[in-house]
């Protein structure tokens, strides 16, 4: 059981949501698939706020073993405390226990036929005439695994895409630094609603409170700041905006990480290789959210990989079907979010307050173009920021 085989149709590197969904779909459609995970336990370390979209859309039952809270919307809170409620439409979802959820996705992949190897570090890949040699340190032993297709799902610090000549590394200005406490004894505005705080308290980012059953994820994401994310987060815990609600809060876990928020990478396919998930920039530049997007793109990559094996064609041209599919569905929304992020980062606290005062207090969805018209009508001085959206 410990030993790896000499060859596979598909090798997926990284057992996060993108990698597990890719390997699941590849195996389900007949490809001999290996899923490699560098950690000794799938799902650790946890690096994010753990919010996911409707799992039913992926054919996944929201099992109580990993679902901690149902989410029906969120509060957008301006520096002056003005609250805008976003509720209904596509805002519902779940907060999950990532340690359990990620492992569930991997188990699902294993049940579809994937071989899984934890504590497996890929030290390099080498192009061959018909695929790649993948160099793996698995539980201390060295292996060379031959494969026809590599799927790089190895996260924001992806090396696999770089080995293959596909640029995936981001500059520090494209990485959102995140810090988060999981805390008990937190009083939320609503136990089924997320809370988002903006302004100078979290430069070029936001602070979040996400309900998680008996606990709450209290976190921050910032970009290119003079201080550490944890410093801003600690200051927020005593901010008047949350006065009386975090006074008795007790941390039970602390997490740090980075989110790629510079938009998707230019090329996600080459001969015998595809890139997916954080490694591909499959993350909203505006919100930093990417679990659902990565799961969806992972399914696409796994499907195309299996088709490629059946067709005995692993060329860039054939694998480009994957890139075409994810770009048709997600590229424009991601680029819009990148534009919105750029605008948001330029706004002062006074301008954020003016925006909150200019839009309805209750929204079913966030249509930025329509909101921009209302904002400028009530606060003409903001036209310089929003003229591209009107």
Swiss-Prot record:
Required cofactor names: FAD
Residues where FAD binds: 18, 37, 48-49, 51, 98, 122, 278, 290-291
One BP annotation, GO: glycerophospholipid biosynthetic process
GO molecular function, one term: oxidoreductase activity, acting on the CH-CH group of donors, NAD or NADP as acceptor
EC number: 1.3.-.-
Keyword Oxidoreductase: yes
Signal sequence coordinates: none
Residues involved in a 2,3-bis-O-(geranylgeranyl)-sn-glycerol 1-phospholipid binding: 368
Associated pathway: Membrane lipid metabolism; glycerophospholipid metabolism
Domain of life, per lineage: Archaea
Stored Pfam families: FAD_oxidored, GGR_cat
Keyword vocabulary terms for this entry: FAD, Flavoprotein, Lipid biosynthesis, Lipid metabolism, Oxidoreductase, Phospholipid biosynthesis, Phospholipid metabolism
Cofactor-binding details, from the entry: Binds 1 FAD per subunit.
A GO cellular component annotation in the UniProt record: membrane
Note: Reduction reaction proceeds via syn addition of hydrogen for double bonds.
HAMAP family per UniProt: DGGGPL_reductase (MF_01287)
Family: Belongs to the geranylgeranyl reductase family. DGGGPL reductase subfamily.
Protein name as catalogued: Digeranylgeranylglycerophospholipid reductase
